[in-house]
Structure formats: C-alpha cells, structure tokens
C-alpha cells in the first residue's frame, strides 16, 4: 500500500488478524508479544490498527496480563515508533512532546523530584572480568562433578509430587552404583548418563539387515543397470518384493525374475539384483519385511493365500502365512508362536544342504614318472622274474 508517499509491502488484513488468533503461547508474555507483532504488521491499515490497540487495552485489564502490566512487563509500541520503523525517519521532538505531556498529566500529583521511572531492563551493571571468572569457576565445578559422576550420585532434594509432609518416597537408581564397570587407571570407560538415553532401534544396529548406505547403493546400482527413473524403480521394487516372497532370496538364484503387467509377463535379469546386493540379497530384502508382511495380510483378506515358502514346509495355519517368507525380520514384538513357526520353517529349508568351497578341478590329468626297470626275463611289464619266482 501507499503510505505518506512510500510504497510499503503489507500482508492482507486477514493474515494480520490471524496473528491475533494465535493462542498456543506457552507464557502470557508470548501472547502480548504476538499482539505487538500484529500492530507492526497492521501499520498502514489505520482502522485495523485502531481496533488492535483497543483490543490490546482490553487484554491488559484481564488476568494474568493485568499483573504483568502492573509490573511493567507489558510491551508497548507507539505510533511514532511504528512510523520510524517503516519510513526510516527519526521521531521529532514535537512528536515526542505529545507523549511527555500525557505522561505528566497522568502523574501531576508528583513533582519532578519524586517521580521515579522504571525501565524493563532492570539488570545490574556487569563486570566483564568478574563474569568471566564466574564462568570459569562454574566450568571447573562441572568438570569435577563429571569426574565424580560414576562414584557418587547426589540425591534430588527438590520437593516433588511424591512428598507428603516431611516424608518423601525413595527413588531407585536406574543403574546401580555397585556395578562392576570396566575401568582403565581407575577411570570408568562408560558414560552412564549417555547410556541411560541411548536406546537405538534394533534394526539400525542389527547384522541381519543391510545398512542404509548399502540399501541406497543397491537401489542406485539396480536403477542405473535397468536404466529407469525413480518412479519406475518403485514399480520394479513392488514386483521384486512379491517375487522374492514366492521364490526366496537365496544366493544360488540365477537367470531372470518375473513380474506381471496385467496378463503379460515381464522378465528382468537377476544379475544386477544380486551383484549390487551387499552383503546379501536377503539382508537387502530384510528392509522390505514389514511391507511384505502387510502385503500377505492384504492378499489373505480377499482370498486364501499362502506363499510358496510356507507351502513347501506344509504350513497349514493360514494365520501364520504372514511370516512364511525367508527374508522375514524377527523382532522383539514377534509373537512366540510366530517365531517358533518361522524358525522351524527355516530349519527345514536348510536341512541336508551342504556347501562346497571347492568344485572339481578342471585339470584332471596326472603326469607321473614311471621308474620301474624290466628285463626280457620278466613276466610282463607289471611283474618281475627272479630265479623262477614271479612277483
């Protein structure tokens, strides 16, 4: 809008009003700051600014804002300050005289010698040197407390909800101080404070699952090998997951894998899938475990569906079909019955299987030197003759 010859970028009045409607402030002071922010944004809309000021005056008469106003903690933005903020022109003495005259009229019962002004910044003057010494002292105290954290735990002396009169409910330590912890030269190797808050996801540190970097490298390698974009790769991953549910993730797989496009079969080479799968394809597909589990549940909601992995093990309980694939990821939340069924199927799948480190050597010929000496009296080339005796 144009104000006093200047074009000023402004929000729409509705956006300014939405600032007033913001009521998720944690402290009453934050609510007052939001109203002052709306005043700043409303400058240029004279009617809107007037209504905001009247609303602010009404708010300061309500609890708990009335107490903040009495303590001088309620912020105020004058018209002169807003004008100077937007135009960059400093306030003149005539404009400031208006506020000075009103202030004197409100305090006409006091003379100049009795009038006392209180500013919001009521902090004492700070000595930089003393402040730095205080910080160094506090830092040394914290370091000393950190060294003694493994030896002594200071009890909390604050009154809490468990306190009744002069009696307090004892608090048990999460980690006992009597534990035998590893130490070097008398200093503990563990940070107990960090250990109490270190609760990583089991999947993130499990050796049975490929790391996130390995999964990303596999995805990027397969995508480049198939020469597809990210959206097409999503469809390929869908088909690969369903194919692996039926056919497994053995390292002996070779040839091609298949997915359906309507009634038409579409084949893809398995070589890129296996080549970029580090450490193994089963560890890569473990990231798809929960998605595969949900997919089997979805199929069973419309028809009886048992993956081939379960059919081969003669699994008759369709309630366990969701666990009948070889890249299923066991977790702490897996039911005991499902865990037993999965482990039995896994044991049956690997029963009698043997892996040979070396195959048959292709160079099967033997080069031997025959050192046997025969004479004309020998019976044949394999038998000797000595004085009529045959050996």
Curated annotation (Swiss-Prot):
Compositionally biased spans, kind Basic and acidic residues: 127-145
Protein name (record): Genome polyprotein
Organism listed in the record: Clover yellow vein virus
Protein modification: Genome polyprotein of potyviruses undergoes post-translational proteolytic processing by the main proteinase NIa-pro resulting in the production of at least ten individual proteins. The P1 proteinase and the HC-pro cleave only their respective C-termini autocatalytically. 6K1 is essential for proper proteolytic separation of P3 from CI.
Family: Belongs to the potyviridae genome polyprotein family.
Top EC class for this record: transferase
Annotated EC: 2.7.7.48
Sequence segments annotated as region (Disordered): 127-165
Pfam families hit by this protein: Poty_coat (PF00767)
Keywords: Capsid protein, Nucleotidyltransferase, RNA-directed RNA polymerase, Transferase, Viral RNA replication, Virion
């Amino acid at each position: 809008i144009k104000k006093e010859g200047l074009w000023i970028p402004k929000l729409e009045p509705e956006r300014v009003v939405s600032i007033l409607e913001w009521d998720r402030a944690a402290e009453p002071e934050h609510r007052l700051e939001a109203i002052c922010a709306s005043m700043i944004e409303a400058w240029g809309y004279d009617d809107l600014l007037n209504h905001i000021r009247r609303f602010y005056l009404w708010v300061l008469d309500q609890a708990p804002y009335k107490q903040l106003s009495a303590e001088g903690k309620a912020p105020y933005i004058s018209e002169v300050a807003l004008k100077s903020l937007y135009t960059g022109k400093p306030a003149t003495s005539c404009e400031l005289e208006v506020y000075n005259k009103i202030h004197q009229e409100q305090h006409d019962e006091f003379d100049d010698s009795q009038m006392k002004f209180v500013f919001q910044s009521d902090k004492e003057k700070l000595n930089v040197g003393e402040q730095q010494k205080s910080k160094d002292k506090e830092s040394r105290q914290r370091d000393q407390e950190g060294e003694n954290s493994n030896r002594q735990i200071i009890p909390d002396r604050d009154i809490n909800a468990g306190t009744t009169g002069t009696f307090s409910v004892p608090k048990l330590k999460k980690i006992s101080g009597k534990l035998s912890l590893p130490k070097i030269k008398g200093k503990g190797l563990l940070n107990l404070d960090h250990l109490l808050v270190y609760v990583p996801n089991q999947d993130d540190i499990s050796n049975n699952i490929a790391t996130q970097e390995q999964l990303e490298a596999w995805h990027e390698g397969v995508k480049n090998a198939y020469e597809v974009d990210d959206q097409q790769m999503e469809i390929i991953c869908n088909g690969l997951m369903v194919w692996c549910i039926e056919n497994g993730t053995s390292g002996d797989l070779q040839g091609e894998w298949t997915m359906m496009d309507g009634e038409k079969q579409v084949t893809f080479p398995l070589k890129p899938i296996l080549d970029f799968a580090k450490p193994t394809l089963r560890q890569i597909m473990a990231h798809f475990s929960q998605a595969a589990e949900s997919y089997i549940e979805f199929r069973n909601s419309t028809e009886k569906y048992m993956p081939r992995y379960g059919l081969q093990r003669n699994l008759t309980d369709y309630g366990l079909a969701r666990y009948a694939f070889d890249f299923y990821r066991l977790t702490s939340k897996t039911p005991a019955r499902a865990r037993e069924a999965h482990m039995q199927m896994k044991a049956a799948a690997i029963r009698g299987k043997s892996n040979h480190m070396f195959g048959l050597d292709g160079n099967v010929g033997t080069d031997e030197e025959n050192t046997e000496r025969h004479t004309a009296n020998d019976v044949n080339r394999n038998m000797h003759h000595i004085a009529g005796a045959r050996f």
